[in-house]
Amino acid sequence: MARVTVEDCLEHVENRFDLVLKAAKRAHILELGGAEPMVPRDNDKPAVLALREIAAGYDVTREGQEQETEEVDVGRNVLAETAKMNKAVASQKESEV
């Protein structure tokens, strides 16, 4: 398990804020199983894996985007169905009164 430094990562991202956002997003994808790590796992947690990938120069923004798009679409569908159900329940209650 190699140590990852901020300086190693900053060679591949513009600033610390961008590093935090990219690493957090990638760690979330890794944790959900939306993508395989691009570096050896070595018993590291997803956040460390994400930082190691960035330090190694991998483009972590591309990996897992398809999975994220699917999750957003599913979320929208769930919201739409919930809204329809709420509207139906409200209509039923109005007709009972």
From Swiss-Prot:
Enzyme Commission designation: 2.7.7.6
Record has Zinc-finger as a keyword: no
UniProtKB keywords: DNA-directed RNA polymerase, Nucleotidyltransferase, Transcription, Transferase
InterPro entries documented for this protein: DNA-dir_RNA_pol_omega (IPR003716), Pol_omega/Rpo6/RPB6 (IPR006110), RPB6/omega-like_sf (IPR036161)
GO molecular function, one term: DNA-directed RNA polymerase activity
A Gene Ontology term for the protein's cellular component: DNA-directed RNA polymerase complex
Presence of the UniProt keyword Chloroplast in the record: no
Enzyme class: transferase
Catalysed transformations (reactions): RNA(n) + a ribonucleoside 5'-triphosphate = RNA(n+1) + diphosphate
GO biological process: DNA-templated transcription
Function recorded in the entry: Promotes RNA polymerase assembly. Latches the N- and C-terminal regions of the beta' subunit thereby facilitating its interaction with the beta and alpha subunits.
Similarity remark: Belongs to the RNA polymerase subunit omega family.
Complex and partners: The RNAP catalytic core consists of 2 alpha, 1 beta, 1 beta' and 1 omega subunit. When a sigma factor is associated with the core the holoenzyme is formed, which can initiate transcription.
Protein name as annotated: DNA-directed RNA polymerase subunit omega
